[in-house]
Amino acid sequence: MNVNVPVPSTLADPLVIAGRTFSSRLFLGTAGYPNQKVFLDALEASGSEMATASIRRMSLEGYEESLADLLTGRVHILPNTAGCQTAKDAILTAELAREALETDWVKLEVIGDRELLYPNVEELLKATEELVNRGFVVLPYCNDDPVTCQKLADLGAATVMPLGSMIGTGLGIANPHMIELICARSPVPVVLDAGIGTASDAAQAMELGCAAVLLNTAVSKAHDPVRMARAFRYAVEGGRLARLAGRIPKKLHAEASSPEFGLVGS
Protein backbone atom coordinates (compact mmCIF):
# COMPACT_ATOMS: atom_id res chain seq x y z
CA MET A 1 0.00 0.00 0.00
CA ASN A 2 1.25 3.45 -0.89
CA VAL A 3 1.11 5.51 2.31
CA ASN A 4 2.32 8.77 0.78
CA VAL A 5 -0.11 11.53 1.74
CA PRO A 6 -0.57 14.17 -0.97
CA VAL A 7 0.61 17.56 0.23
CA PRO A 8 0.27 21.08 -1.16
CA SER A 9 3.18 22.54 -3.12
CA THR A 10 3.42 25.68 -0.97
CA LEU A 11 3.31 26.60 2.68
CA ALA A 12 0.17 28.65 2.14
CA ASP A 13 -1.94 25.82 3.52
CA PRO A 14 -3.72 26.87 6.71
CA LEU A 15 -5.43 24.10 8.62
CA VAL A 16 -9.21 24.06 8.19
CA ILE A 17 -11.44 22.16 10.61
CA ALA A 18 -15.21 22.34 10.17
CA GLY A 19 -14.87 25.56 8.21
CA ARG A 20 -12.66 27.26 10.78
CA THR A 21 -9.14 28.25 9.71
CA PHE A 22 -6.03 27.96 11.89
CA SER A 23 -2.59 29.20 10.92
CA SER A 24 -0.97 27.29 13.81
CA ARG A 25 -0.95 23.50 13.75
CA LEU A 26 -0.14 23.22 17.44
CA PHE A 27 -3.02 22.89 19.93
CA LEU A 28 -2.33 23.21 23.64
CA GLY A 29 -3.85 21.76 26.78
CA THR A 30 -4.32 23.87 29.88
CA ALA A 31 -3.75 21.51 32.82
CA GLY A 32 -0.87 21.29 35.26
CA TYR A 33 0.96 24.58 34.83
CA PRO A 34 2.72 26.02 37.90
CA ASN A 35 0.68 29.21 37.82
CA GLN A 36 -1.40 31.50 35.64
CA LYS A 37 1.53 33.58 34.36
CA VAL A 38 3.52 30.56 33.22
CA PHE A 39 0.46 29.19 31.43
CA LEU A 40 -0.25 32.44 29.60
CA ASP A 41 3.40 32.93 28.67
CA ALA A 42 3.60 29.36 27.37
CA LEU A 43 0.40 29.80 25.40
CA GLU A 44 1.81 32.91 23.75
CA ALA A 45 5.17 31.28 23.07
CA SER A 46 3.48 28.29 21.44
CA GLY A 47 1.65 30.40 18.89
CA SER A 48 -1.35 28.14 19.41
CA GLU A 49 -4.78 29.33 18.34
CA MET A 50 -6.78 26.62 20.10
CA ALA A 51 -6.60 25.45 23.71
CA THR A 52 -8.48 22.56 25.26
CA ALA A 53 -9.74 22.27 28.84
CA SER A 54 -11.98 19.95 30.80
CA ILE A 55 -15.38 21.49 31.46
CA ARG A 56 -15.02 20.20 35.04
CA ARG A 57 -11.93 22.39 35.53
CA MET A 58 -12.99 25.58 33.79
CA SER A 59 -13.45 27.45 37.08
CA LEU A 60 -11.40 25.21 39.40
CA GLU A 61 -7.83 25.60 38.14
CA GLY A 62 -6.71 27.91 40.93
CA TYR A 63 -5.85 30.81 38.65
CA GLU A 64 -6.87 34.35 39.50
CA GLU A 65 -9.46 34.19 36.74
CA SER A 66 -11.47 31.27 35.40
CA LEU A 67 -9.98 29.46 32.42
CA ALA A 68 -12.91 30.58 30.30
CA ASP A 69 -12.19 34.22 31.09
CA LEU A 70 -8.46 33.75 30.52
CA LEU A 71 -8.88 32.09 27.14
CA THR A 72 -11.73 34.12 25.69
CA GLY A 73 -10.37 36.48 23.06
CA ARG A 74 -6.95 34.80 23.08
CA VAL A 75 -7.66 31.44 21.47
CA HIS A 76 -10.48 29.21 20.30
CA ILE A 77 -11.66 27.25 23.36
CA LEU A 78 -12.08 23.51 22.87
CA PRO A 79 -13.86 21.97 25.87
CA ASN A 80 -13.20 18.29 26.43
CA THR A 81 -14.98 15.43 28.15
CA ALA A 82 -11.96 14.17 30.11
CA GLY A 83 -12.82 11.58 32.74
CA CYS A 84 -16.00 10.33 31.08
CA GLN A 85 -16.28 6.55 30.78
CA THR A 86 -19.62 6.21 29.00
CA ALA A 87 -21.21 7.77 25.96
CA LYS A 88 -24.05 9.02 28.16
CA ASP A 89 -21.70 10.93 30.48
CA ALA A 90 -19.69 12.34 27.58
CA ILE A 91 -22.82 13.59 25.83
CA LEU A 92 -24.06 15.25 29.00
CA THR A 93 -20.67 16.90 29.56
CA ALA A 94 -20.61 18.16 25.98
CA GLU A 95 -24.08 19.66 26.41
CA LEU A 96 -22.98 21.41 29.61
CA ALA A 97 -19.96 22.83 27.79
CA ARG A 98 -22.12 24.07 24.94
CA GLU A 99 -24.41 25.85 27.36
CA ALA A 100 -21.60 27.32 29.47
CA LEU A 101 -19.23 28.36 26.68
CA GLU A 102 -21.64 28.82 23.78
CA THR A 103 -19.64 26.54 21.52
CA ASP A 104 -20.57 23.48 19.49
CA TRP A 105 -16.99 22.24 19.47
CA VAL A 106 -15.96 19.38 21.73
CA LYS A 107 -12.88 17.23 22.15
CA LEU A 108 -14.54 13.91 22.82
CA GLU A 109 -12.86 11.60 25.30
CA VAL A 110 -14.47 8.37 26.49
CA ILE A 111 -12.02 6.39 28.60
CA GLY A 112 -12.17 2.63 28.98
CA ASP A 113 -9.63 2.27 31.78
CA ARG A 114 -8.77 4.87 34.42
CA GLU A 115 -5.23 3.56 34.83
CA LEU A 116 -4.31 3.33 31.15
CA LEU A 117 -6.55 6.24 30.04
CA TYR A 118 -7.14 4.26 26.86
CA PRO A 119 -10.22 5.02 24.72
CA ASN A 120 -13.38 2.92 24.98
CA VAL A 121 -14.00 2.53 21.26
CA GLU A 122 -17.56 1.22 21.49
CA GLU A 123 -18.72 4.09 23.71
CA LEU A 124 -16.67 6.60 21.71
CA LEU A 125 -18.44 5.64 18.48
CA LYS A 126 -21.85 5.88 20.14
CA ALA A 127 -21.08 9.30 21.58
CA THR A 128 -19.67 10.58 18.29
CA GLU A 129 -22.76 9.57 16.35
CA GLU A 130 -25.13 11.17 18.86
CA LEU A 131 -23.16 14.40 19.25
CA VAL A 132 -22.85 14.84 15.48
CA ASN A 133 -26.62 14.36 15.22
CA ARG A 134 -27.01 17.10 17.84
CA GLY A 135 -24.96 19.53 15.78
CA PHE A 136 -21.62 19.30 17.57
CA VAL A 137 -18.23 19.64 15.91
CA VAL A 138 -16.65 16.47 17.30
CA LEU A 139 -12.89 15.98 17.64
CA PRO A 140 -12.55 12.46 19.11
CA TYR A 141 -9.51 11.14 20.99
CA CYS A 142 -9.02 7.57 19.80
CA ASN A 143 -6.56 4.70 19.58
CA ASP A 144 -4.04 4.43 16.74
CA ASP A 145 -6.26 2.13 14.68
CA PRO A 146 -7.07 2.98 11.04
CA VAL A 147 -10.38 1.11 11.20
CA THR A 148 -11.60 3.04 14.24
CA CYS A 149 -10.48 6.31 12.68
CA GLN A 150 -12.37 5.52 9.48
CA LYS A 151 -15.53 4.70 11.45
CA LEU A 152 -15.28 7.99 13.34
CA ALA A 153 -14.87 9.92 10.10
CA ASP A 154 -17.83 8.06 8.57
CA LEU A 155 -19.95 9.10 11.56
CA GLY A 156 -19.14 12.75 10.90
CA ALA A 157 -16.18 13.51 13.17
CA ALA A 158 -14.47 16.76 12.14
CA THR A 159 -11.04 15.26 12.86
CA VAL A 160 -9.61 12.06 14.23
CA MET A 161 -7.15 12.33 17.11
CA PRO A 162 -5.17 9.10 17.52
CA LEU A 163 -2.83 8.72 20.45
CA GLY A 164 0.91 8.60 19.94
CA SER A 165 1.20 6.66 23.19
CA MET A 166 -0.69 6.66 26.48
CA ILE A 167 -1.65 10.03 27.96
CA GLY A 168 1.06 11.68 30.03
CA THR A 169 3.71 9.01 29.40
CA GLY A 170 5.99 11.09 27.19
CA LEU A 171 6.88 7.95 25.24
CA GLY A 172 6.44 9.62 21.88
CA ILE A 173 4.92 7.87 18.87
CA ALA A 174 4.86 4.17 19.74
CA ASN A 175 3.66 3.02 16.33
CA PRO A 176 4.64 5.49 13.62
CA HIS A 177 3.61 3.12 10.83
CA MET A 178 0.00 3.10 12.06
CA ILE A 179 -0.06 6.89 12.37
CA GLU A 180 1.21 7.15 8.80
CA LEU A 181 -1.46 4.70 7.61
CA ILE A 182 -4.17 6.70 9.37
CA CYS A 183 -2.94 9.90 7.74
CA ALA A 184 -2.90 8.23 4.33
CA ARG A 185 -6.47 6.94 4.63
CA SER A 186 -8.28 9.61 6.61
CA PRO A 187 -10.75 11.91 4.81
CA VAL A 188 -10.54 14.37 7.72
CA PRO A 189 -7.54 16.06 9.40
CA VAL A 190 -5.49 13.83 11.70
CA VAL A 191 -4.39 15.46 14.95
CA LEU A 192 -1.88 13.50 17.00
CA ASP A 193 -3.02 13.51 20.62
CA ALA A 194 -1.28 12.12 23.72
CA GLY A 195 2.11 10.69 24.57
CA ILE A 196 4.25 13.49 23.15
CA GLY A 197 7.40 13.92 25.23
CA THR A 198 9.56 16.46 23.48
CA ALA A 199 9.78 18.61 20.38
CA SER A 200 11.21 15.91 18.11
CA ASP A 201 8.08 13.79 18.70
CA ALA A 202 5.92 16.61 17.35
CA ALA A 203 8.18 17.06 14.33
CA GLN A 204 7.93 13.34 13.63
CA ALA A 205 4.13 13.47 13.79
CA MET A 206 4.05 16.23 11.20
CA GLU A 207 6.54 14.41 8.97
CA LEU A 208 4.30 11.33 9.07
CA GLY A 209 1.45 13.39 7.66
CA CYS A 210 -0.48 14.62 10.69
CA ALA A 211 -2.35 17.88 10.16
CA ALA A 212 -1.68 19.09 13.71
CA VAL A 213 -0.47 18.07 17.16
CA LEU A 214 -2.25 18.50 20.49
CA LEU A 215 -0.20 18.28 23.67
CA ASN A 216 -0.28 19.28 27.32
CA THR A 217 2.01 17.52 29.79
CA ALA A 218 5.12 17.86 27.62
CA VAL A 219 4.87 21.62 28.07
CA SER A 220 3.17 22.07 31.45
CA LYS A 221 5.53 19.67 33.27
CA ALA A 222 8.72 20.71 31.49
CA HIS A 223 11.44 22.35 33.58
CA ASP A 224 10.85 25.52 31.56
CA PRO A 225 7.31 25.38 30.10
CA VAL A 226 7.64 28.64 28.17
CA ARG A 227 10.84 27.60 26.44
CA MET A 228 9.41 24.15 25.71
CA ALA A 229 6.27 25.69 24.23
CA ARG A 230 8.44 27.71 21.87
CA ALA A 231 10.41 24.58 20.98
CA PHE A 232 7.19 22.80 20.06
CA ARG A 233 6.10 25.72 17.93
CA TYR A 234 9.25 25.49 15.84
CA ALA A 235 9.15 21.67 15.79
CA VAL A 236 5.63 21.60 14.36
CA GLU A 237 6.55 24.23 11.78
CA GLY A 238 9.73 22.35 10.89
CA GLY A 239 7.96 19.02 10.63
CA ARG A 240 5.31 20.53 8.39
CA LEU A 241 7.97 22.12 6.18
CA ALA A 242 9.75 18.77 5.90
CA ARG A 243 6.50 17.07 4.95
CA LEU A 244 5.76 19.64 2.28
CA ALA A 245 9.33 19.50 0.96
CA GLY A 246 9.32 15.70 0.64
CA ARG A 247 12.07 13.58 2.16
CA ILE A 248 14.50 11.61 0.01
CA PRO A 249 13.80 7.87 -0.41
CA LYS A 250 15.46 5.47 2.01
CA LYS A 251 18.08 3.24 0.37
CA LEU A 252 20.03 0.16 1.43
CA HIS A 253 23.29 1.25 -0.21
CA ALA A 254 25.38 4.41 -0.25
CA GLU A 255 25.02 6.86 -3.11
CA ALA A 256 27.63 9.59 -3.49
CA SER A 257 26.30 13.11 -3.89
CA SER A 258 29.41 14.31 -5.74
CA PRO A 259 29.95 13.36 -9.41
CA GLU A 260 32.71 10.89 -10.33
CA PHE A 261 33.90 13.09 -13.21
CA GLY A 262 37.31 14.59 -12.51
CA LEU A 263 38.35 12.11 -9.82
CA VAL A 264 42.10 11.51 -9.63
CA GLY A 265 42.85 8.29 -11.43
CA SER A 266 39.57 8.20 -13.36
From Swiss-Prot:
Work out whether the entry's keyword set contains Transferase.
yes
Q: Which SUPFAM superfamilies match?
A: ThiG-like
State its Enzyme Commission number(s).
Answer: 2.8.1.10
Check the record and name the PANTHER family matching this protein: THIAZOLE SYNTHASE (PTHR34266:SF2)
Q: Which family would the database say this protein is a member of?
A: Belongs to the ThiG family.
The subunit structure is: Homotetramer. Forms heterodimers with either ThiH or ThiS.
This chain belongs to the protein called Thiazole synthase
Q: Which organism is it from?
A: Azorhizobium caulinodans (strain ATCC 43989 / DSM 5975 / JCM 20966 / LMG 6465 / NBRC 14845 / NCIMB 13405 / ORS 571)
